[in-house]
Amino acid sequence: MTDHSHENWRPASNPWAVAIVVTLAVFMEILDTTIVNVALPHVAGSLSASYDESTWVLTSYLVANGIVLPISAFLSRLFGRKQFFLICIVMFTICSFLCGIATELWQIILFRILQGFFGGGLQPTQQSVLLDYFKPEDRGKAFGLSSIAIIVAPVLGPTLGGWITDNYSWRWVFFINIPVGIVTVLAIYQLLEDPPWESKSKEKLSVDWTGIGLIALGLGCLQVMLDRGEDEDWFNSNFTRTFAVLTLIGIIGAIYWLLYAKKPVVDLHCMKDKNFAVSSLLMAGMAMILYGSSVVIPQLAQQDLGYTATWSGLVLSPGAILIVLTIPLVLKLMPIVQTRWIIAFGFACLATAFFWSRTLTPDIDFETLVLFRSAQSIGLGFLFVPLTTIAFISIPRRLNADAAALFTMFRNVAGSVGISLSTAAITERSQAHSAHLATHTSAFDEPFQQTIRELAQAIQNFTTQVGDPTGIATGRMYQAMIEQSRFLAYVDVFTILSVVALLLIPFCLLLSPVKSEGSAGAH
């Protein structure tokens, strides 16, 4: 079949029915990356393991998931896209069941590795399906549907996981995947079909074991380093330094091999497309901001403001809803406003929203915290669909699968980097602020000593049943200093995220205006 006939290929099934089903599968997979987080203490207790050991339940999933992402296009061609997608969902569902019945920690870690491996093929395959099933002018709407899964699932995960664990058992965190998996398998079997350029391609494919090995080494070690780095005191430990060296060897070796190999496992030619390359960079930056803030804000709510897991989830939920409501407006704007200006506006909104944190105080209430997150969500709503649409606008159909795999990989890896850097910055900046404030708490600092005397007097006036009012007052002052240091650290992280968003705006201007019909246009 000629390239021209490939471009004119249209699926027999309703594209929207297919889009809903494949997005449901991706929603299930993304939900699984966060739903387990709050259940870890229960998993550790049930399986007689320490909390630190139980965190490998998360790490193992992320490592396997990250390795498969870039090679999913090759696997899709090897097995056929429909068959590969079905294998991924079936095995993901089976592994979910096995995780739920595990009786030893090593068992659940093994099944999570397999679950992450098969789950890693879902996101890029879903995106390539949307690219092939929808005309360029309709892709914006399809990506809008996909964005809902990417946005809502990570936010819903901790809240749903906490509710399930509190009311039932941690095992049901895995069991809820089973009915969703069964429904999606049956629907995809009926609806999905392979495009002609991928059908039976496995007959002419050879396996690039070197490329696969280098990718597995580089991305696998990177995910371990990012996920375990803070617990291992980052580069002060031999563990982190070793994995950093292995990461560099794997990634540099993989790039060199993929560029010069005759039949590489990942086709990097799509990176020659300027819009795709710049959009990938911008999506990576947005993912760093989104995932970093999505971890830091609940951490602030739970550890410093005393919120439950459910209430901290509710802090994020209105923002997720706001993004979903913003998407139709963005789709209306895309045919009449240059896409690069919409993206630049989104990053400007993000920068402004995060800079607002400098006006917040440690006694912030629930409503203000929700507004703070919602302000960020307005900017995020102007980024998801335009970035994804313009990234693929000029990619040839034969490269859709490779481009989707790389685009998803950039987003997920950058998200992991954002989480690790944000949590590490909280610790480092908290210590720095504590050291600074401690210089004002000596016995020779008269304002501090005066405050101690006044607080001690107030305690003594309130009740006489105290042994040492001055000691109690001093303890409270030091506790207040620690709380103030922690809050200032959060403000510092939000300020850094604001600067990152600001620095990304000039890159939006590198996007080439592309004339196209409807919402796909970036004219």
Cite the ranges covered by each PLM segment.
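Transmembrane-helix exit segments and adjacent C-terminal regions of multi-pass membrane proteins
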Residues: 1-26, 193, 256, 263, ...
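Transmembrane core module of solute transporters
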Residues: 13-73, 77, 85, 96, ...
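Transmembrane alpha-helical cores of Major Facilitator Superfamily
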Residues: 27, 59-63, 90, 144-152, ...
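Helix-loop-helix hairpins in multi-pass membrane proteins, especially solute transporters
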Residues: 69-212, 228, 237-238
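A membrane-interface helix-boundary motif in multi-pass transporters
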Residues: 166-178, 228-240, 308, 427-499
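C-terminal membrane-cytosol helix-exit motif in multi-pass small-molecule transporters
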Residues: 179-197, 216-228, 246-260, 507-512
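Helix-loop junctions on the cytosolic side of multi-pass membrane transporters
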Residues: 186-205, 256-265, 362, 428, ...
